[in-house]
Regions:
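N-terminal [4Fe-4S]-dependent radical SAM core
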Residues: 1-33, 53
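Conserved alpha-helical substructure of the radical SAM core
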Residues: 28-55
């Protein structure tokens, strides 16, 4: 489906993450130095593939003073220079480093995405080194510094959240000016990861979507 619309996602910053999130299959551990030619290589790939929509995401790099923000900036600029594609960034939280977030904003992506992932009660289990309020603060900062830039967030469902908790998250996202929301069913990557508590039927996704649209 994505490829038919010339959409692709690139993960930058290496393939090892500094955070052990319970839902994610990306390897955790000791990271390597950033590859300084990576921005240009991503741009070349996007150009050769003729992409119309490029999503850039990354591992979390808590080992870097700016969390990799300058690398993000250079990657967005390189893709912009080589292609006419729209660019969406899906960033980590940069440990609440506002200057790092500002640097990514300065690259002027078409969409700024930062996932909420789950409800506050489950953060300690799902996103152990993340913080719910930090996520909201990041999305709000983007709106404050670039009001015209669409913001986006995503939630995984089926981890044990309640409808009431989801509604509170939807209200919080609306309060900080989040423009777009994606909802997805959590799927367990391996037996070592968090189990699926429930598979939601399509009509429940529709119900939650309608709740979000009414806010």
């Amino acid at each position: 489906e994505c490829w038919s619309t010339k959409t692709a996602t690139f993960m930058i910053g290496g393939n090892v993450c500094t955070r052990p999130c319970g839902f994610c299959s990306v390897p955790k551990g000791k990271t390597e130095e950033l590859e300084l030619d990576e921005p240009e290589r991503v741009a070349e790939a996007a150009a050769r593939l003729g992409l119309r929509y490029v999503v850039i995401t990354s591992v979390t790099r808590d080992d870097l003073p700016d969390g990799g923000a300058e690398h993000w900036y250079q990657t967005v600029l390189a893709v912009r220079q080589r292609t006419g594609a729209q660019i969406e960034v899906l960033t980590p939280d940069f440990r609440g480093n506002r200057a790092a977030v500002t640097r990514v904003i300065e690259s002027r992506p078409d969409v700024f995405n930062h996932n909420t992932e789950t409800v506050p009660r489950l953060y300690h289990r799902v996103r152990r080194n993340a913080d719910y309020q930090r996520t909201l603060d990041l999305l709000q900062q983007v709106k404050q510094e670039a009001p015209e830039m669409p913001t986006k967030s995503g939630l995984m469902l089926g981890l044990g959240e309640t409808l009431e908790e989801l509604y509170e998250v939807l209200a919080d996202l609306r309060r900080v000016g989040c423009d777009m929301l994606t909802l997805g069913q959590y799927l367990q990557p391996s037996p070592e990861h968090l189990p699926v508590e429930r598979f939601l039927p399509p009509e429940e996704f529709d119900e939650i979507g309608e709740l979000a649209k009414k806010l």
